[in-house]
């Protein structure tokens, strides 16, 4: 929310400053482009736009803070609608109370959610509610679900995408029934998972793919795994991706950060903080990659990598909540329910753990030897010790009072 406010204020101030041509940041022009969606105008709106961005919200209350928060989100949507006005994307809002029947018809249940209607699909946006993130998300959605790789330079560009899941298939041509099944499968995961295809034998040979074969690339892995039992139907591809879409090592991204955080293993995340642009952070990330590659067959291991540079407004919150210093690499286990956490002791930046030491620590986490409940017990023990100390103090004071009483009796005698 702070980011939204700063963004709006920053854009407002920029409107009063001079800028060279070609660097004029967009500022809200005051024109209303976001409309209220109802049963009456639903068909008309759906026919008009290729893509419909829908914000499903609770009724606006009389609370001033809640009103300001709603207004800020509305301004963000207006700015995004203005920037993408030429892209034939509609922007609407649905009041959960006024349009309860419509919400039920569309399958919306979670207030405060942002949905995108594309064809017959509904895609939920589960990322940071910020103008730049939303614009990038929507632009990715209007692109073709499959990107074609035809030459060596495009292969190099493909290979440089290392921090996200990607698939690449080799097909005869665009009319191939297996390519069409691949396209249909890609639509299920757009824009979160990238699908690529090639019709070039030279590209396929370089990537070690046979006809109608699809390679599945896990983030940060050296080699892909070939999906078995080719050729595939749409349903088979979708099922395989769903079964393997939790990588051994994955980044937290603004566009799907909440969905990723909710995708925990038994209520916990193994979280690693490392700045890729920092030498120590880069070194630590390379160690994490090695650990992930050595343990990619372990279904119980999933490490969530967070680059603090991607979330500047959350750094102070994370440091306070987890009681850690994010100016140096960190790795810990976090309980997603109450944010309790336990962190590996890293003495200093010059003494980062080796891959073997990290693996030993992770094994202790997976076995339950290291867990956040132990941290709670230690806190309770500390509280108990403090209580006992207080009791001891009370006993001492009581003894002193008794001694004073005896002295008084002697004086009376």
From Swiss-Prot:
The keyword Metal-binding applies. Detected in stomach and vas deferens (at protein level). Belongs to the calsequestrin family. Phosphorylation in the C-terminus, probably by CK2, moderately increases calcium buffering capacity. Residues 1-19 form the signal peptide. The modification Phosphotyrosine is found at residue 282. Monomer, homodimer and homooligomer. Mostly monomeric in the absence of calcium. Forms higher oligomers in a calcium-dependent manner. Dimers associate to form tetramers, that then form linear homomer chains. Interacts with ASPH and TRDN. This is Calsequestrin-2. One of its GO terms (molecular function) is protein homodimerization activity. The keyword Transferase does not apply. GO terms for biological process: cardiac muscle contraction; cellular response to caffeine; intracellular calcium ion homeostasis; negative regulation of potassium ion transport; protein polymerization; regulation of cardiac muscle cell contraction; regulation of cardiac muscle contraction by regulation of the release of sequestered calcium ion; regulation of cell communication by electrical coupling.
């Amino acid at each position: 929310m702070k980011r939204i406010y700063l963004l709006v204020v920053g854009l407002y101030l920029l409107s009063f400053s001079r800028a060279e041509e070609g660097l004029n940041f967009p500022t809200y022009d005051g024109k209303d482009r976001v409309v209220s969606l109802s049963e009456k105008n639903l068909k008309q709106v759906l026919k008009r736009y290729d893509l419909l961005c829908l914000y499903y919200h609770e009724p606006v209350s009389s609370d001033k803070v809640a009103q300001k928060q709603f207004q800020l989100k509305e301004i963000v949507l207006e700015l995004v609608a203005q920037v993408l006005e030429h892209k034939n994307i509609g922007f609407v809002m649905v009041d959960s109370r006024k349009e309860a029947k419509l919400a039920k018809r569309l399958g919306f249940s979670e207030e405060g959610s942002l949905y995108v209607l594309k064809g017959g699909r509904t895609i939920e946006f589960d990322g940071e509610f910020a103008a730049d993130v939303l614009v990038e998300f929507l632009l990715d959605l209007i692109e073709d679900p499959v990107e074609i790789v035809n030459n060596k330079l495009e292969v190099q560009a493909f290979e440089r995408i290392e921090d996200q899941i990607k698939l690449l298939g080799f097909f005869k041509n665009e009319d191939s029934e297996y390519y069409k099944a691949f396209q249909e499968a890609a639509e299920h995961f757009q824009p979160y998972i990238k699908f690529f295809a090639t019709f070039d034998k030279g590209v396929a040979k370089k990537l070690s793919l046979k006809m109608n074969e699809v390679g599945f690339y896990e983030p940060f892995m050296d080699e892909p795994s070939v999906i078995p039992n080719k050729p595939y139907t749409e349903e088979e591809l979708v099922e395989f991706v769903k079964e393997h879409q939790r990588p051994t090592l994955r980044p937290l991204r603004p566009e799907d950060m909440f969905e990723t955080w909710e995708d925990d293993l038994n209520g916990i995340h193994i979280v690693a903080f490392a700045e890729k642009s920092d030498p120590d952070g880069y070194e630590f990330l390379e160690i994490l990659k090695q650990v992930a590659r050595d343990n990619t067959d372990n279904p119980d291991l999933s490490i969530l990598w967070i680059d603090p540079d991607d979330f500047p407004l959350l750094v102070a919150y994370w440091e306070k909540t987890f009681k850690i210093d994010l100016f140096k690499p960190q790795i810990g286990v976090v309980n997603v329910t109450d944010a309790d956490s336990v962190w590996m002791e890293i003495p200093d930046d010059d003494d980062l753990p080796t891959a073997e030491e990290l693996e030993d620590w992770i094994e202790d986490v997976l076995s339950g030897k290291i867990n956040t409940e132990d941290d709670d017990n230690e806190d309770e023990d500390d509280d108990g010790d403090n209580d006992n100390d207080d009791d001891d103090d009370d006993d001492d004071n009581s003894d002193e009072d008794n001694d004073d009483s005896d002295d008084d009796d002697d004086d009376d005698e």
